[in-house]
Amino acid sequence: MTVEEVRGSLDLTDNGAIRNSIRNCLTVFQNDPYLQGAIRYNILTERIDIVKPLWWEKPTATLNDTDFNYLMLYLEDKYGLTSEKKIEKAISIVADCNKYHPIRDYLNSLKWDGTERIRYALTRYLGAEDSEYTYECLRLFMLGAIRRVFKPGCKFEVMLCLVGGQGAGKSTFFRLLAVKDEWFSDDLKRIDDDNVYRKMQGHWIIEMSEMIATANAKSIEDIKSFISRAKETYKVPYETHPADRLRQCVFGGSSNTLDFLPLDRSGNRRFLPIMVHAENAKVHILEDEAASRAYIDLMWAEAMFFYHNFPVRLTLSKEMNKELKVLQKQFMPEDTKAGLIQSFLDNYNGTQVCSKLIYAEALNHPFDEPKQWEIREINEIMNNSIEGWTAFSNPRIFAKYGRQRGWERAASGNEPAATGSILPDGFRELTEEEARQMELPF
């Protein structure tokens, strides 16, 4: 429709003037030859965008006060519509009727050529080891990013962590992986910031640089909790009530420090560390930025193929989780206490131990009674960091330490663990008959 045709379709007052109504404003936005299709609601940023070029310069697509003033001037000049509130409401309605998600649109536009690239990307650009672990971690991260876009708020609790020297290209890799610079952010420095949602809003991949490496014991638990969160409850300035904002982003970590992970014997399962070596990279990621971006487009096309054609599990495989647990030890501070206990057990003649025995003999506290937190720490070390020993749940009698739960040396080959026999370290396991006589439950 031409401007004249649109003007002729507007409702009039009894006096024949164009009515200043929301309906008339809406008709203009939906049919004017310049404004038709120009105003859309961006689901990613939760803001209104102007998505086609108009007659003034705009640095970004997001509708701002200046844009609104230009639109008011145009409606006043061409249609005699002057009610600011009604124009504002009409903009809100027309935008809501034309929602779009730029990342979904981008991902849905991609076509994979059948060549694997995710498997080799970190080796190609950052010199990471070419391994199944490297491949699975990057693929998981990309599939999590896709799922978060198509199903905001879905459960995704892992952070891909790139570890290596300064200037290796870690941050650049995350930035280019986000496709557009406005979909990437490295501005999240504190997770207790009142404006944390606003710093995440509109971004797809958020880099947390060195945050984990500088965290203390309390803040690392806060970081774990933060990564696991599926939403933020937040009130933007122009709203009356807080609302749940489902997450559409994923988090990447980068560190120049090798032992960046906290000492956590129960496992840092949320953090997927990958060591990078810039000197081993086949191509520097900024050597030909256009070529790197084209390569990354095809990585996302590959990830979308997997997303649509195979069941998506946003966790590592069981085998890879075992490898992760071993690998993570390289990125944690040395566990000196676990080392002392392992050395003691490797030279220990007995086949069964309890936490009190470990405290007294391995940690050299023969005359002290362990505190509860020390018992918990020993249990954590024995259950997570010690090799060659397995826990037993039925309490057994220890000569010096009474009736205790503990651990027994893992049997070698098909040799069964000894039961009911006198052991060289001064204790023996009770038989069921002896336990019944002593009224000890098994």
Range-by-range predicted roles:
Residues 1-116, 132, 136, 368-369, ...:
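N-terminal nucleic-acid engagement/recognition segments and initiation subdomains in replication
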Residues 361-369:
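Short helix-coil junctions and helix-kink-helix linkers
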Residues 263-281:
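A short helix-turn-beta junction within AAA+ P-loop NTPase domains corresponding to the substrate/partner-engaging
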Residues 205-227, 261-267:
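Conserved AAA+/SF3 P-loop NTPase catalytic/coupling segment centered on the Walker-B
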Residues 306-350:
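Conserved alpha/beta core segments of nucleic-acid transaction machinery
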Residues 220-243:
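Conserved catalytic/switch belt of AAA+ P-loop NTPases
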Residues 91-201, 205, 356, 363:
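P-loop NTPase catalytic core of nucleic-acid-dependent motor ATPases
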Residues 196-201, 236-254:
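AAA+/SF3 P-loop NTPase mechanochemical coupling elements
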